[in-house]
């Protein structure tokens, strides 16, 4: 038995020795030796073993472990140092980028040569190379065809190169491939920028906070910053407020902000008015891009949420999002404004909200050859205060820098340069009209004079008409992804066309050809609006009605102005009994809109019964009517006579004086096969359709000698 106990005790003793901790004296001497010699030889380890009472093997392992520990400590320290240096360099890089934006050349006092200059040089070289290649291919084609090969003129916009002269005289020519007239909606799909990095988030949050503070100061500032200019606003005042740029620069001074290139135009405006919606509901509209586009189809042609930076707890308060937006004035004659910006929503106190916008430069876009932004939104937004009876008081501030790289179309030059095209009064007027329409949509009852329409049918009809208006407005954009071709011809009417493959369930499937032209008329906006929306005068301009009268079957009002309504029209001709026309007319202090689309009777019955109208295909056409913005006219940059006071009188947008800029737009289904070709005859047909419509409108309004086209 003793024989078995002894090995057990010796094993336990070895285990205790294996995990034996060194004494403080042993550790002190080992550390001292390690400082002198981290790699002791065998003799040194033997001497330490005798002095400390440890085995040589223990000495060897201790030094190995100590060297490994020191190496790990050094690596951690180096990593921390390199990480700090990396963060420091990145911050310095960002600061240098910001400084370069505002640096001033000491010689000429202007900005230095930027990356866009070198990008322009590269593009010129690439264009020269492509021109040589085109000339070479043209020569080869001429030899093959045995006749000269005609090219389009150099001024033809990009992505619209074609060997076919799209003129009225081009009837019976060869078919035109679909890709040669490329619309934006079915071309290259829109690519959102990448989400915000962790490095960018705090910077954007700081920018949004500063923008919010500046917005509140601007919204509450007095006459020292805001000056009154003639024209009136949506609230019925005698003048509208524009920003005094010099005073603004002195108060909100920014590095290099005193210098602006001659091509940069500053637009600043402020407007206040009552809106039929609560402050909380308005904040939700502003922070939801889908609702944002639905409320402002006449201004916002496209909007996307790139990233949600801060998701407010318990509502929209303290929410921060990064947005992309395209702004337009519903004509292909003026390019859209494309803006990346952060939107900050904050509840300041009970019943008072603030929405602040400010542009951000997404530097990562520059690596993919994206052009520098032409539009830059400075701190803008609105203050929203709850009032009685479901109303809110909105103070809107719009502040933007725009670089005009190409001449503005002569018809819209006064309207754009005055700041009225995208000013605060236009935003607020559109918001007031949209809120009235929404209140009519959610109202439970139906006016007693609307016979045969149920509340469900009314809502269904309003939703269908809203989709029609949104589709029409978005089809008029002129962005990089949605470009138009100007038709050549001897006629004075300059028609722009584009086409796309339609696969949207809300549109007919196939090839859709869109055409539009803009004209100036020496007639007040409200007169033009009343003429084109009235079913009694429709036969005077509607070519497709062949001079036959139309009758209004039903009308649904959607605002306090009688001009804001939805109508179902029916032709009195026996051949038109199977089709109806859905029409919505909209007007506010900034302009007017008349949109219509054919709809068959079975589809109309589906809508009137209250069923879902989302699958009913529509191909809308219509008119946009804007004041010409000429100085001194009552229909200038903003118009007071068509505000809420004029609404009771039934006046349209633009007031009772001055001229109008009218855009006429048609969409036609060329073929129900998406892969089909477009024949020049189809282009000539729509060209003739627009030309005839324009001439008939001018004749009916007694201004045949005054029409002017871009």
From Swiss-Prot:
Residue stretches of biased makeup (Basic residues): 14-23
Protein role: Probable transcription factor.
Coiled coil: 82-144
Biased composition (Low complexity): 630-648
UniProt-annotated stretches for the region Disordered: 1-23, 630-650
DNA-binding feature ranges: 15-74
START domain: residues covered: 197-440
Protein name: Homeobox-leucine zipper protein ROC8
CDD domains linked to this entry: homeodomain, START_ArGLABRA2_like
Organism, scientific name: Oryza sativa subsp. japonica (Rice)
Source taxon at top rank: Eukaryota
Alphabetical UniProt keywords: Coiled coil, DNA-binding, Homeobox, Nucleus, Transcription, Transcription regulation
One annotated GO molecular function: DNA-binding transcription factor activity, RNA polymerase II-specific
Main location: nucleus
Family: Belongs to the HD-ZIP homeobox family. Class IV subfamily.
Subcellular location: Nucleus
GO annotations of cellular component type: nucleus
């Amino acid at each position: 038995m003793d024989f078995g106990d002894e090995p057990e005790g010796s094993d336990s003793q070895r285990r205790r020795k294996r995990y034996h901790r060194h004494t403080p004296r042993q550790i002190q001497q080992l550390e001292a030796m390690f400082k002198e010699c981290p790699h002791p030889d065998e003799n040194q380890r033997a001497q330490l073993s005798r002095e400390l009472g440890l085995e040589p093997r223990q000495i060897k392992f201790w030094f190995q472990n100590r060297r490994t520990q020191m190496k790990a400590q050094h690596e951690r320290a180096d990593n921390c140092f390199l990480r700090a240096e990396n963060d420091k360099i990145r911050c310095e890089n960002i600061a240098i980028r910001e400084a370069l934006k505002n640096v001033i050349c000491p010689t000429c006092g202007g900005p230095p040569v930027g990356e866009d200059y070198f990008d322009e040089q590269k593009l010129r070289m690439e264009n020269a190379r492509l021109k040589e290649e085109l000339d070479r291919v043209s020569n080869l084609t001429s030899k093959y065809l045995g006749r000269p090969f005609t090219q389009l003129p150099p001024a033809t916009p990009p992505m619209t190169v074609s060997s076919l002269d799209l003129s009225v005289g081009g009837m019976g020519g060869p078919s035109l491939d679909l890709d040669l007239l490329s619309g934006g909606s079915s071309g290259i799909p829109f690519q959102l920028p990448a989400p915000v990095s962790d490095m960018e988030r705090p910077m954007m949050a700081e920018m949004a906070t500063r923008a919010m503070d500046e917005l509140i100061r601007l919204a509450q500032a007095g006459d020292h910053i805001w000056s009154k200019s003639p024209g009136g606003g949506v609230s019925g005042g005698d003048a509208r407020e524009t920003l005094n740029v010099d005073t603004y620069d002195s108060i909100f001074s920014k590095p290099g902000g005193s210098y602006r290139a001659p091509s940069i135009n500053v637009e600043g405006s402020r407007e206040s008015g009552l809106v039929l919606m609560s402050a909380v509901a308005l904040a939700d509209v502003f922070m939801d891009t889908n609702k944002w586009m639905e409320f402002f189809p006449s201004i916002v042609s496209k909007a996307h949420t790139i990233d949600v930076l801060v998701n407010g707890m318990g509502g929209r308060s303290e929410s921060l999002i990064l947005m992309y937006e395209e702004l337009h004035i519903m004509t292909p004659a003026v390019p859209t404004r494309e803006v990346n910006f952060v939107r900050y929503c904050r509840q300041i106190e009970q019943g008072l909200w603030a929405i602040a916008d400010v542009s951000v430069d997404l530097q990562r876009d520059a690596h993919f050859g994206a052009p520098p932004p032409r539009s830059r939104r400075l701190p803008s937004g609105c203050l929203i205060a709850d009032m009685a009876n479901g109303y809110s008081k909105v103070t809107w501030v719009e502040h933007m820098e725009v670089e005009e790289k190409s001449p503005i179309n002569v018809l819209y030059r006064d309207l754009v340069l005055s700041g009225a095209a995208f000013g605060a009064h236009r935003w607020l007027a559109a918001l007031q009209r949209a809120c009235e329409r929404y209140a009519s949509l959610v109202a439970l009852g139906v006016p007693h004079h609307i016979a045969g329409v149920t509340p469900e049918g009314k809502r269904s009809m309003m939703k269908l008409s809203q989709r029609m208006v949104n589709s029409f407005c978005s089809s008029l954009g002129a962005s990089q992804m949605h470009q138009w071709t100007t038709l050549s011809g001897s006629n004075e009417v300059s028609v722009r066309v584009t086409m796309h493959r339609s696969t949207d369930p809300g549109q007919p499937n196939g090839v859709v050809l869109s055409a539009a032209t803009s004209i100036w008329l020496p007639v007040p906006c409200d007169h033009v609006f009343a003429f084109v929306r009235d079913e009694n005068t429709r036969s005077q301009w509607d070519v497709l009605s062949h001079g036959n009268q139309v009758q209004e079957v039903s009308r649904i009002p959607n605002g306090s102005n009688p001009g804001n309504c939805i109508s179902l029209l029916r032709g009195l001709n026996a051949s038109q009994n199977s089709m109806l026309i859905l029409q919505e007319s909209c007007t506010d202090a900034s302009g007017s809109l008349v949109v219509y689309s054919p709809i068959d009777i079975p589809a109309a019955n589906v809508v009137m019964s209250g069923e879902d109208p989302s699958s009913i295909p529509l191909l809308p056409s219509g008119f946009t009517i804007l004041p010409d913005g000429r100085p001194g006219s009552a229909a200038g940059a903003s118009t007071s006579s068509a505000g809420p006071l004029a609404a009771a009188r039934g006046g349209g947008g633009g007031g009772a004086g001055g001229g109008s800029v009218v855009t006429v737009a048609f969409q036609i289904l060329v073929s129900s096969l998406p892969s089909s070709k477009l024949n020049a005859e189809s282009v000539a047909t729509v060209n003739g359709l627009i030309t005839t419509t324009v001439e008939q409108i001018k004749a009916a309004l007694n201004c045949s000698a005054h029409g002017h086209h871009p």
